[in-house]
Amino acid sequence: MAVPKRKTSPSRRNMRRSHHALGANSFIEDKDTGELRRPHHVDLKTGMYNGKQILTPKED
C-alpha cells in the first residue's frame, strides 16, 4: 500500500485544491419568452429547445 513519505503542507494541499471551486451558473434571456434560462437546456415553461417542441408545457 502506498504511504506518503512526507506530510503535505497546507500550501501544497490548497494549491492542489485550487481547481475545485464551483463556478456561477450562467443564464441567457430566451428569445421568445424573455425569461432567463440556462444555455443549451430546455426551457421548462415552454418546452422548447433550439426552436423545436421537446416537452409539453407545464400547466399553471
Curated annotation (Swiss-Prot):
Positions with biased composition (Basic and acidic residues): 28-44
Family designation: Belongs to the bacterial ribosomal protein bL32 family.
GO MF assignments: structural constituent of ribosome
Record region (Disordered): 1-60
Protein name according to UniProt: Large ribosomal subunit protein bL32
PANTHER family: 50S RIBOSOMAL PROTEIN L32, LARGE RIBOSOMAL SUBUNIT PROTEIN BL32
Highest taxon of the lineage: Bacteria
